[in-house]
């Protein structure tokens, strides 16, 4: 994405190896430039090791942009340099590579002339010939190869980047991924990454939206502007179901591919109510921000009217999940908006379990750290407020489980497919493993110790006098027909092999509501301050909890409305109660 934060063009998006940002947030102290920075990860699902490396980055020296002042989410790009003034859009211009380094043409030799004319790439033939010029960074550090392709018939231009790890990146292949002068389409200022492919045939496809006049008051100082230059990152699709060696964009401007994962950047086209999961398809036109602004770095106006309101992670496994587009996580962005300057004031995450259990929002942006003690040894804040509390390894394990380890651990315990690489990284980062290539026995033992620590941390929490808890499940899926049968047979004893998350506060709406009765001495514990998602008052039970099914009340039966009225439902209950198909009354067995 175009960085619009007031930096020079030499600080454009940096190319980074494909990897997922680590969980949580990283707040750094001021460096030699005196700037403070923070990084917030996006809700990106792992996919065989090849997933988009994107995150929200803040710098105290940044300007305004689609994420408010100081914030940016940069994708790979190549741009014309503006260090010597406005580009001339001819051979005299300098190009800046993805790492901000000036690019120079490689030498032309008899064995390797530069430029050359190409009619094909591998087995793919083109309807026109291209003049291909090879470039390299003036100061070599990344050891990638760059090619600038210009069509000899229509003049369309794009870049190919051959990375040292064998990954091929395509930048600006279509007009949607080029930042150009609306009055002169050949005056391209930036080429944005549009597709990447690995040697194994794994693809990532980036989609962009062009600025327009939707929801903008076109009177006054907005009258007569051509605002179509700006490009906003809209979707990142990856996890192609069928491997393909060649770039999809060689043959199609909009690849018709079965993608398994989609990261959606929403600019107000969908609702932002935390209680209502947004749909995959946009419902409305995007919203206009209160503080529109323009950039003129490249000799034409780049007008911005949008703010990214949320980032959504969807999975596409219709056979396994029972629906074409399944929301699994979202990052809600909240702004302090005014006509002068917009600031990001909160970022809240919502996670959606595979069984339909929704985790409540949590504020990801934390208060600033305390100031350092003054020279005299006194602090301007009471020391007790910032005291460091020593925690046992078991409580630390439980806290990490609550924040982001729950999905991997529970899939492992249930015997489901789980991201093994992510599990190893978790064990390594928390000192349960000493190598990232453990033997099967070492990995199994480390997981056993880690799970035992979580369970011990849970059992160390105080008992409660709660007698009823709730859990919402999504069981009306073809893949879960056997599970549904188990849960709808009176007298059955269900053994949950994983940690079981419930709430004594509210029943989160789904097709099945578990109304669970507790007896004195049960092993469930309220996580309280240990919980990462504190808004949901979570009671967690250890693995192998036994539940006996006592009765089932189906929708449409005589007692359904009466029992439904007695349940404490989530805040969006009035809109969603028609989704409830059954209430299952269960009892936790203590032995």
UniProtKB/Swiss-Prot annotation:
Domain spans labelled TR mART core: 373-576
EC number(s) on file: 2.4.2.31
Recorded GO MF terms: NAD+-protein-arginine ADP-ribosyltransferase activity; nucleotide binding; nucleotidyltransferase activity; toxin activity
Catalytic reactions of this protein: L-arginyl-[protein] + NAD(+) = N(omega)-(ADP-D-ribosyl)-L-arginyl-[protein] + nicotinamide + H(+)
Pfam families given in the database record: ADPrib_exo_Tox, SpvB
Membrane-crossing segments per the record: none
Residues annotated as catalytic: 471, 501, 538
Location within or outside the cell: Secreted
Role played: Mono-ADP-ribosylates eukaryotic muscle and non-muscle actin on 'Arg-177'. ADP-ribosylation prevents the polymerization of G-actin to F-actin, causing actin filament depolymerization, destruction of the cytoskeleton and cytotoxicity. Does not possess NAD(+)-glycohydrolase activity, unlike most mART enzymes.
Name of the protein: Mono(ADP-ribosyl)transferase SpvB
Organism listed in the record: Salmonella choleraesuis (strain SC-B67)
């Amino acid at each position: 994405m175009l960085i619009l934060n007031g930096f020079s063009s030499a600080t454009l998006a940096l190319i980074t190896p494909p990897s997922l940002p680590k969980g949580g947030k990283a707040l750094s102290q001021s460096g030699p430039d005196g700037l403070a920075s923070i990084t917030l990860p996006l809700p990106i699902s792992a996919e065989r090791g090849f997933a988009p490396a994107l995150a929200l980055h803040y710098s105290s020296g940044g300007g305004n942009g689609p994420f408010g002042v100081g914030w940016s989410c940069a994708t790979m790009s190549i741009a014309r340099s503006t260090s010597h003034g406005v580009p001339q859009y001819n051979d005299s211009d300098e190009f800046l590579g993805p790492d901000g380094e000036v690019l120079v043409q490689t030498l032309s030799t008899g064995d390797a002339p530069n430029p050359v004319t190409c009619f094909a790439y591998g087995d793919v033939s083109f309807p026109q010939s291209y003049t291909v010029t090879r470039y390299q960074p003036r100061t070599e550090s990344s050891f990638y190869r760059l090619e600038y392709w210009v069509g000899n018939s229509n003049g369309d231009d794009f870049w190919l980047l051959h990375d040292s790890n064998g990954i091929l990146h395509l930048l600006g292949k279509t007009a949607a991924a080029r930042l150009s002068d609306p009055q002169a389409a050949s005056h391209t200022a930036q080429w944005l990454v549009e597709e990447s492919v690995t040697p194994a045939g794994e693809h990532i496809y980036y989609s962009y939206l062009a600025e327009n006049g939707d929801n903008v008051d076109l009177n006054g100082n907005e009258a007569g502007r051509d605002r179509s230059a700006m490009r906003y990152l809209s979707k990142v699709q990856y996890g192609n179901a069928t491997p393909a060696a060649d770039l999809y964009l060689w043959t199609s401007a909009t690849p018709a591919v079965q993608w398994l994962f989609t990261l959606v950047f929403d600019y107000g086209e969908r609702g932002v109510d935390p209680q209502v999961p947004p749909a995959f398809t946009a419902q409305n036109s995007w919203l206009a921000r209160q503080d529109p602004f323009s950039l003129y770095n490249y000799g034409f106006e780049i007008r911005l009217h949008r703010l990214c309101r949320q980032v959504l992670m969807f999975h596409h496994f219709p056979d396994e999940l029972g629906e074409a587009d399944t929301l699994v996580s979202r990052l809600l962005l909240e702004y302090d908006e005014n006509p002068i300057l917009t600031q990001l004031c909160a970022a809240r995450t919502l996670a959606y379990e595979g069984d339909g259990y929704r985790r409540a929002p949590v504020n990801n942006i934390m208060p600033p750290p305390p100031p350092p003690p003054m020279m005299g040894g006194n602090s301007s804040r009471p020391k007790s407020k910032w005291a460091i509390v020593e925690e046992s390894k078991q409580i630390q394990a439980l806290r990490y489980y609550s924040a982001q380890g729950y999905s991997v651990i529970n899939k492992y315990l249930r015997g489901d497919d789980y991201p093994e690489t992510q599990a190893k990284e978790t064990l390594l980062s928390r000192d349960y493993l000493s190598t990232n290539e453990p033997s099967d026995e070492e990995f199994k033992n480390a997981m056993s110790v880690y799970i035992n620590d979580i369970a011990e941390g849970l059992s160390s929490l105080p008992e409660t006098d709660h007698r009823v808890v709730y859990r919402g499940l999504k069981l009306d899926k073809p893949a879960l027909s056997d599970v549904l049968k188990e849960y709808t047979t009176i007298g059955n004893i269900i053994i949950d092999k994983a940690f079981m998350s419930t709430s004594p506060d509210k029943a989160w709406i789904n097709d099945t509501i578990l109304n669970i009765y507790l007896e004195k001495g049960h092993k469930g514990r309220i996580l309280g301050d240990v919980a990462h998602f504190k808004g949901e008052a979570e009671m967690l039970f250890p693995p192998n909890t036994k539940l006996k099914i006592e009765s089932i009340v189906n929708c449409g039966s005589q007692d359904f409305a009466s029992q439904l009225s007695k349940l404490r439902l989530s805040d969006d209950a009035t809109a969603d109660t028609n989704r409830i198909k059954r209430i299952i009354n269960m009892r936790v067995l203590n032995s």
